[in-house]
């Protein structure tokens, strides 16, 4: 029996406003408990919520970026439930009419086990504004639970997809693309450790693509891409095994235990009627006119997809390279700065170096590209020295770039090349003499090459490079050898 996995995601993105969605209290992370909670956040009597305009504009920015409809009129509703860290006994959210309606997000799914990657588009159902709840501190007090209301009232944009994903890999790829987009737009800092970006996964299975949807379970508060993938894969296995053993999947909310790598039941899954939604009488309908939308549209940065398309057309980059270079705004800016100095002719080389040597060194040092020890101008100079034949690409990787990364000579490629004596041989007469000596000393390899053994030619190239201590231009060595062997 071929099972099909069906996944939809709800993502809570904390909006990057300085103050909360309905009060003037700060949203800064890490303050002492209950020091950033205004009377509205504490649900003190006689206080009224005031909507944060910045939160609304960030929602509009997101809606425009995904091609969604911005509702001309949306309603705030009270979502009623009891929890100790929810002082009002309800959460202000949006239910029937969200501010952002529809939209799509297109992204790349990496291939696995030899399978090629592919492009995927997910339909978004909605994105609505709401306030966050406070935080229960279970481990800080012996036999008691503490309540920190600093987070209460923090502005969230809850982004909901259609059940369009068919594997954990697709769900993770979507989450990564969404994470990159909200950071690119500047509407969320994307800090998953601090809870700024967290996902709920709705997972079900069915017997093939034409079967009715199965009973779904919601896995709450997944705050890393690894946890998201592990939780979905476990839940899929659990549901399939349960059904195949004659059991029935129960609609419920589950939590993921990363230590045991399993999900466990938290509570039965609520339906909308359980929350008794009704319009909040303290808040007027949110009215967004076309003029407001156009003012916000004018502030939008170039979007990743548009920039990637420009990189393909302007610089002749492959689609994969363009997508990697536009994964973050900082990476794209670094690439464009390198190309501005090195010239468009070196764009492909710049892309290769940024995705290769620069990325691997950043990963090892756990640095963002903004903090790279090698500046775009310094990398551009290194590329120029490769292009003009001063050094080979191999020498640049093995000897020059590591020294630049370590800050030798202020990261100046020319100074490092001179100090280490790495400049390639420019005297063709001297190189020709060395190659003659190599051919004379390796008569067996010459004979094997002439007998049709291509590997013998590579051996001769290696001997020539060794004789020049790596200072010869490999392309020039190849050309001279072929000429002298009559293979040119």
Swiss-Prot record:
Q: MF terms per GO, please? A: asparaginyl-tRNA synthase (glutamine-hydrolyzing) activity; ATP binding; glutaminyl-tRNA synthase (glutamine-hydrolyzing) activity
Q: What class of enzyme is it?
A: ligase
Under Enzyme Commission nomenclature, its number is 6.3.5.-
Keyword Chaperone assigned to the entry: answer is no
Q: Which SMART domains match?
A: GatB_Yqey (SM00845)
Query: Known Gene3D superfamilies for this protein?
Result: 1.10.10.410, GatB domain, N-terminal subdomain
Show the catalytic activity.
L-glutamyl-tRNA(Gln) + L-glutamine + ATP + H2O = L-glutaminyl-tRNA(Gln) + L-glutamate + ADP + phosphate + H(+); L-aspartyl-tRNA(Asn) + L-glutamine + ATP + H2O = L-asparaginyl-tRNA(Asn) + L-glutamate + ADP + phosphate + 2 H(+)
Q: Name one GO biological process term.
A: translation
Keywords associated with the record: ATP-binding, Ligase, Nucleotide-binding, Protein biosynthesis
Q: Please name the NCBIfam families in this protein's record.
A: gatB, PRK05477.1-2, PRK05477.1-4, PRK05477.1-5
Instruction: Indicate the quaternary assembly.
Output: Heterotrimer of A, B and C subunits.
**What family does the Swiss-Prot or TrEMBL record give for this protein?**
Belongs to the GatB/GatE family. GatB subfamily.
Q: Which HAMAP family match?
A: GatB
* Job of this protein: Allows the formation of correctly charged Asn-tRNA(Asn) or Gln-tRNA(Gln) through the transamidation of misacylated Asp-tRNA(Asn) or Glu-tRNA(Gln) in organisms which lack either or both of asparaginyl-tRNA or glutaminyl-tRNA synthetases. The reaction takes place in the presence of glutamine and ATP through an activated phospho-Asp-tRNA(Asn) or phospho-Glu-tRNA(Gln).
- What name goes with this protein? Aspartyl/glutamyl-tRNA(Asn/Gln) amidotransferase subunit B
Q: What is the scientific name of the source organism?
A: Ralstonia pickettii (strain 12J)
Gene name of the record: gatB
